[in-house]
Amino acid sequence: MSGTYGQLVLDAHTALFDRGDTGVLDTAFSENFIEHSPLVAGDRDGLRTMVEGAGDAVGYTNARVLADGDLVALHGRFTGLDETDLVGFDIYRVADGKLVEHWDSLVPVAAPNPSGRTQLDGPVKVDSSVDSEASRATVTEFFTRTLIDRDYDGFRRYTRDGVFLQHSPDIADGVDAVIGYLEDLKAKGQGLVYDRIHRTVADGQFILTHSEGSVAGVRHSYAELWHLSDGVLTEMWDAVTEVPADAEALHDHGIF
């Protein structure tokens, strides 16, 4: 992580979700903290109830931290919050040294994918010599043309020599594999529809896109982490989860 708030957010998040220290909600989280997670009602009080309910079972292991201005993204694994461990992304916004807002996209832990990759393995260190804004521009352009516009050949144009390392549980490595997967779902009427990007977190060669869309007509949140090498896409991780309509959520902040 190369930004200002990465360690602050990681420390607070780890205290809460790995050590079960709910006192951190009073010291590191703003009194007006806004919680967008579809799993939580009641902002700070809702998080307190969730963690206290998990008791000694609560745990968190971090794999990656991305810091980008007032946003920090964490990629990791939770225990104790559900019947199975959860893997995915947390995005925090920081203001005046406090955590003021949070979004997440979490999915059950899965077995290694057809290429043997897991939801968390792979490179973790941010290369601060890479221009984060250039990385953001590349990924945003790719995302818009390829996923929102559904021109899946974009995977060929934004990669090199067909190399694309895949951590999504259902897809093997390679450009052909990801295009085939997306085209097959589309042909079955279960295609992944991307409507808009709500936010990006860019740190060196890593870029997280947090977007909204639908799968087979059902509203979903997409959190997808892209890795670039020499300006081309080389690797990705994701957490794609069904989310309720804002009017049906446990809170009135909206999911996004």
Predicted segments, located by residue:
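C-terminal and inter-domain tail/linker signature
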Residues: 1-256
